[in-house]
């Protein structure tokens, strides 16, 4: 039986537990400036609801009760001018959630509308009180220096779902991801950090449910403190998640979470209400002068993180994941929203300062996706110096150089050298450019060299969704080469492999922090779908059965060599002292060389001992080398070395070193 113990405390937010006079006390606290009354709703094992009125201190409602134990479900009922106490409201600080709403039809959605006066307690998601006990043993973060970091972006389910080396019951789970087979694979590859697509509790949007689809990526969050349970092989997702993190740490691999603080799953104003909208709509969401939601995320709403409560919610959440789950870093989705305080972007926004000053976040890696779709939303290079940033200019300029005839060699060199035009300011170092060719959002590397057009028909939006400009090239045939006869089939496949190799080596040997999309190292495909957010199936799951061993070995060897090159692991901007840019005859690049639109080949000397031969032309290229004795290292499948000359017989990237 649940009983009021006393008025409780306004801090901390959410629930907290302590023992007083040999009695287990649970304190609940909820912010709502708009409410005129709040009821705490507790559910016993027979699903019987107990409603207890909460006490207000300024804008926080709180209450301490007895009788709460692990597994107890709770929610709130909000009273006020714009509230509806007939609807259960989820705690924004919920550490676990029981139930996902059915939004597949107009009728099912109507139960969650504030305008609907039916009680939805039997349908609404509820927070769950959980045990956070866990034996971390002597777990410590690998704390890999930024200059030595190689990020590997993956999806928890998709990584192991089709891997027959993993026990069937564990595939697609936290336990499956941390299976010794996977850890050994990642160690062999050489990556130092995994960046997990969202593992916070999320739900499927109404339009996807109506089509029988799911939000596979997970960028539709409902409870940012809660571990997503559908990736758990056990009935204790939090403990299983912690076990996974501990296993990664033992393997020397950091765990970075992709987090979504820019919007919530509540979408547009007329859509179902689950949490923040029902608590204090005016505080939690940005609105325009007409009172409508500002939708600069493309997801129906934009969270207001300039308010005290919004900033506190974010910092409290980050602290929870670090302290409870030993997380090593965060990648912030549509991170421009974090700096919107007017709501224009401000690189000195208070939230950035709060994050910087939070003690638990001092050694944590912070990565921004530095854009949204709003006013002045594109902010690449403008985040505080303690953030790294996804560099889409790197992606686009390298793809144009390798795959398009119009790609400029000067743009390639600028990106390859660390994008100093974007990041060399405010005492920032090269690691702050997080370089990538592909990510979850867009083509895979294999598809980038296999498709001229996106093929998103299975998403149900008549191929309207996804980026239209991918800077891709199919090398003569769209998609599969099965319809081709020899020798054309082999020619197309070889050219695609050469292009993938060139892009991979460019990524892994560029100045800055490289990020590799899971599966690119062995030629994974999504069959041309460049927006597979709703495909929880064979389209997105890694296809281990089609493993390209040659590509994997190249990737592994390139990563290993990167770790030997001082100019790439000292986090320093390149200068004439450690880099030389040479043309194909071995002479310093001239202004004319850089500006020549036909120039698609060059040589780069790093640290006066590593020679990179780069040829982005479809045909072969002869290079006159600097007068040294050079020894081939990697990318040598199409190189002939004789005296002071080297010939790449086709498109390619070759590394040599001074014997």
From Swiss-Prot:
Family stated for the protein in its record: Belongs to the glycosyl hydrolase 13 family.
Keywords, sorted A to Z: Glycogen biosynthesis, Glycosidase, Hydrolase
Molecular function terms, GO-annotated: glycogen debranching enzyme activity; hydrolase activity, hydrolyzing O-glycosyl compounds
SMART domains: Aamy (SM00642)
Enzyme Commission designation: 3.2.1.-
InterPro entries, sorted: GlgX_C, GlgX_Isoamylase_N_E_set, Glyco_hydro_13_cat_dom, Glyco_hydro_13_N, Glyco_hydro_b, Glycogen_debranch_GlgX, Glycoside_hydrolase_SF, Ig-like_fold
Site (Transition state stabilizer): 441
CDD domains xrefs: AmyAc_Glg_debranch, E_set_GDE_Isoamylase_N
Record flagged with keyword Hydrolase: yes
UniProt GO BP: glycogen biosynthetic process; glycogen catabolic process
Residue ranges, compositional bias (Basic and acidic residues): 456-468
PANTHER family membership: GLYCOGEN DEBRANCHING ENZYME (PTHR43002)
Domain of life: Bacteria
Protein's UniProt name: Glycogen operon protein GlgX homolog
Active site as annotated: 333 (nucleophile), 369 (proton donor)
Gene transcribed to yield this protein: glgX
Region feature Disordered, mapped onto this chain: 456-486
Source organism of this protein record: Haemophilus influenzae (strain ATCC 51907 / DSM 11121 / KW20 / Rd)
